[in-house]
Amino acid sequence: MDPNNKVSINKNMGLLRKCLCHDEYNKKRFCYSRFHHKTLLYKQLYEISKILRRLNSGLDMWCLRDAIISALGAMHDAPHVDRLLGQFYLKTNSASEFDSISLILESENILQKELIEFVRDSKVELEKILQAAIHVWRAKFSPGVLAASRFLDEISNSFNGIEENIPTIFLRISVTLASQIKKIEYLQKSFVSHKCPLVEEILILLYKRVCMLPFPCMSNLGLVSEKKSVFDTVFHNVSNFSLEDFLDINSGFFLPAMLNGSYVSVNLTRYHYEAESLMELLLSQLQIVEKDTNKTTGLTIYLEIWHLSLLMWLDFCEILPTTVQVKFCLILPEIFMERLKTENSYWSVFHKALAINLGLYDESDFTSKYLECERTAEHARIKTETLLDNICRCLRRGQMGFIFRKNIHKYSMLPQIASYCLGNSMDVIPFEYGLNTAFRIALNLSYFVENVSEEQKSHTNIDMFHYRDKIFNLKKMRKTVTELVLIGNAVIDYALENRDFLMDGIVNARSLAICVTGLHSALMSMNLPFNSQLGCQLYRIVCENIYYSSVRTSMNCCKKGAEPCSFFQRSKYAQGILHCDLYDNVEYTLPNVLWTNLRSDIKKYGLRNLTFVSGSAMSKEFDLLNCSQSFCPIEGNKILKRSSIKVLHPNPVFHSDLSVYSTELQTLYIPVYNGLFLNRFKNHLEYLSSVNYDVSKVNKNLFSEEEMQEMTIFLNAFDYSVNEMLNMYVGALPFTDHGQANVFFINKTENMRDILVCLYQNGFKTGIYQAVYKNQKCDGVNPSKKFDLLSGFSDGVVMSTMHVFQ
């Protein structure tokens, strides 16, 4: 290691990384001089050399990427260019010039002593494991350039002047978790039956993109640091604090949490006259995080709908720029939902002290107390229809969500404790006027889709979901979920042991959330239409299996010696009641005897955790998994800008307003995240390059009848009715105990009032996380932003993209 190649630390600006090609410090991650024609195995060296002569130090990486693709006339080379850029600029390849083991051993001032000792003692074994991992890290598992860039920007660790590469990050995480598991007896006993070493087990999960831990966890696990957390979500109830107390908490808690990259949720309903100054404070701190660090964070503001300050906060919601990472969430009691059903009804809001007192009542007593306050106390009235219109305007901006207070009370596993929500995806967790956190893990469902083998044809439906020549391997998924619950508990124990500054919120319930990610990718891989009966059935079965495996594993932890979590005796689990028991007419696929035994075992041994399964997406981490963000047919910018981009030459005459062109190249980009569409219809490339991919315009003159039927799985999100979406979600509600956040695509003909009532009556705890209105889908586009290749909502194959960049 070059002793001169050290990192310089500036406390105000963070790390100044030393360029490995020049003898100078540079804050930029990429050094473009390292990218020259000798590194490209292409024939068009003359065109590339012309590009390179135009390069300068301020050139954006995406400019370089698109310039290379343009010069190559890259019909099929864009994915390869992405991988090449990823390897040379981001060091995502396993054969990196920096040895991960040596880098860890030489970073004693940055990494924990136990981690260093573990690596030193297991060096030979780790080298063999890493060699095996190289074979796993094939091209299809390597992240695209933008996914890798975002991942490394979020992690942003520098060891002795060398930026951590992805193999080093994965090794650091795996070694830290393996070391933690070996120290804790109940975890060690749970992993004892596994054949391969712990480090290898965890490494393979990460390398194969089976799962992804939260970015704060990936960034901070194993490091010696202060004011850092492994948790990416945190809720702090400040509704009973004075403004002075809030400002004090903000400096000591909220800002460090934002700088950590965690999503912060806060109840600010009681603040009325102070609302404007509070918003300015929070927005300024969000800007500080965005400007001075590589972290991204978000803020969710919870509003109780019976407060007088409600309308002021709704006004703030309407004027906030759509680019600001702030969400508002309304807490709706039963009486409001009943009045919503009635035309010409009115809603009453109360002044600060009375409204705060009203919010302390349990939902079972809330309605009677609310009616009493309406009769006896001073209040303001607003027509319910007018209030709903104000709310819908915020919904159209994509910055409003709902919580149904009655459903949380009815379906909560902790009935004695008021429950609110948490995080950017509105996950439901319990709290008692304090701090709460949860540990979330993204599970990539597309990993479990396989071709049918002769051996698998004999398996029962409990282990395999069959559809034509594909299967969804439920047995493999249950095994993986078991491992993830154990890993989650290891992270929680690690946080408590290392005095994590958000650790207080995890102690009582030890909340876990296995986030269901990539369902839509899995359905497309199986050629299953998203809204089909079989598609809905698979989603319900998946959630049932995840919930059962999670609860069973948590119980086994206690059976092997762990103490039940603090809130267990106060929960319905202590009575042998499962979350799915709270719902009527639940359909089960797993045998009843398994559920019966699970209930009795829980009463006997207890549970290490209280929440388990989330339908919410992890909005940053999913991109590295190379799958759809959630179970909804939506693909945002992040998932489309990566190595699975195919390029077709544009038609010089036809310029549809539904086509997407880059600023300089005028090249039509068609993202296909599983390659299914272009592979199937490769004989129709000429047609595809001249039409706008509107499925309704495709006819039998261009495709065979069989192809026409297959194309029905490629629908734009707006082609599904909200009722179709609800049918899928409702079946899995009994098994999604933690978060039920949903994105709905609403056409002009669909009534927001009806949708809200339907969600409420079907037992959703959290309602709409985001509503996308068809006539509003072009909002928030910044035409001056270069190479925003795709923005919008599709099912992975872009049938109807949205913007033209001139």
Curated annotation (Swiss-Prot):
Subcellular location(s) of the protein: Virion; Host cytoplasm
Q: Fetch the Pfam families from UniProt.
A: Ribonuc_red_lgC, Ribonuc_red_lgN
Keywords per UniProt: Host cytoplasm, Late protein, Virion
Cellular component aspect of the GO annotation: host cell cytoplasm; virion component
In the record, biological process GO terms are: deoxyribonucleotide biosynthetic process
Give any GO molecular function from the UniProt entry: ATP binding
Disulfide bond entries: none
What this chain does, per the record? Does not possess a ribonucleotide reductase activity. Betaherpesviruses probably use another strategy to expand the dNTP pool in a quiescent host cell.
Similarity comment: family membership: Belongs to the ribonucleoside diphosphate reductase large chain family.
Q: Which PANTHER family match?
A: RIBONUCLEOSIDE-DIPHOSPHATE REDUCTASE LARGE CHAIN (PTHR11573), RIBONUCLEOSIDE-DIPHOSPHATE REDUCTASE LARGE SUBUNIT (PTHR11573:SF6)
Protein name in the entry:
Ribonucleoside-diphosphate reductase large subunit-like protein
What is the organism field in this record? Human herpesvirus 7 (strain JI) (HHV-7)
